[in-house]
Amino acid sequence: MRIALDAMGGDNAPKAHVEAAIRAVQTFPELEVTLIGNEEQIRPHLTDTTRLTVIHTTEKIEDTDKPTTAVRRKKEASMVLCVKEVKEGNADACISSGNTGALMTAGLLYVGRIKGVERPGLAPTLPTIDGNGFLLLDAGANMDASPEHLLQYAIIGDAYRRNVYQQKNPRIGLLNVGAEAGKGTELTKQAYQLLENSSLHFIGNVEARDLFAGVCDIVVCDGFSGNVVLKSVEGTAKMVFSLLKEQLTSSLPAKLAAGMLKPQFRNLKEKMDYSEYGGAGLFGLKAPVIKAHGSSDANAVFHAIRQAKEMVDNEVTKTITQKLENGGE
């Protein structure tokens, strides 16, 4: 198995990506990784070249670039070449920490969408108290959606959780402002009916305040709402740890207490850190395309590689295709 990795995307490129790739091939003996980017910047961090290949390019897509224009004009950009590796059959999956819109555009243009999928969605796994996490779909690939899109997201999410997490009957919730069936917009009301009449394990509406308690395994929503949830999670996590740090360094007794509780705080941080779950899959494409967070460190990129490997191992794309053809069955 070979995974293509855009080594120039994100805030910590290429060091974090090279370190993650080395760790990945050491962890998974059957894995090969192609690093794509500026070889002069990559090589100093390549302490081990076992099953690692570098494709050199100096061109990259910036976060400020307009996605469609950048993908069409910067044909030698590291992200574009990364996605092309999948199209040309040289890689089974690809990962980038770069411009989200550009990655979606490149994925649609070169990998292509699964037959029947109108709008691929962005799907990160976010933390829950029980440690199992929940899949959020769509987290911002498409700002609006139809009821049929939300049903497709549920089918796609169901296939992912069954194959990668080995869940027999994943619980699916519809993000809404209340738990009652009649709540919400026309979109959520119609989507509720479609989900309720499907063969999926639909548990009804779920509110944002309950998501992290682990009330369901998959949450479906339009991309606007999903992105608000995602950004709220990021902001809340930063605020909580900032406040904890402030309080626990405010006095000598507080510092002593913090030292005694260091393992517990480490466990808490790991549980709340959604990078441990991998990146956000661009679900609905013909092959795994993973968007890692722009601020991903080596650990986060490693878990994105692990996630891509698991998707290939468990033939997630094939299962999604079959489920969509059979109406979710």
UniProtKB/Swiss-Prot annotation:
GO terms for molecular function: phosphate:acyl-[acyl carrier protein] acyltransferase activity. SUPFAM superfamilies: Isocitrate/Isopropylmalate dehydrogenase-like. It is an enzyme of class 2 (transferase). Keywords: Cytoplasm, Lipid biosynthesis, Lipid metabolism, Phospholipid biosynthesis, Phospholipid metabolism, Transferase. The keyword Cytoplasm applies. It catalyses: a fatty acyl-[ACP] + phosphate = an acyl phosphate + holo-[ACP]. Pathway: Lipid metabolism; phospholipid metabolism. Pfam families: FA_synthesis (PF02504). GO terms for cellular component: cytoplasm. InterPro entries: FA_synthesis, Phospholipid_synth_PlsX-like. One of its GO terms (biological process) is fatty acid biosynthetic process. It is found in: Cytoplasm. Its EC number is 2.3.1.274. Coiled coil: none annotated. The keyword Phosphoprotein does not apply. Homodimer. Probably interacts with PlsY. HAMAP family: PlsX. Catalyzes the reversible formation of acyl-phosphate (acyl-PO(4)) from acyl-[acyl-carrier-protein] (acyl-ACP). This enzyme utilizes acyl-ACP as fatty acyl donor, but not acyl-CoA. NCBIfam families: plsX. Belongs to the PlsX family. This is Phosphate acyltransferase.
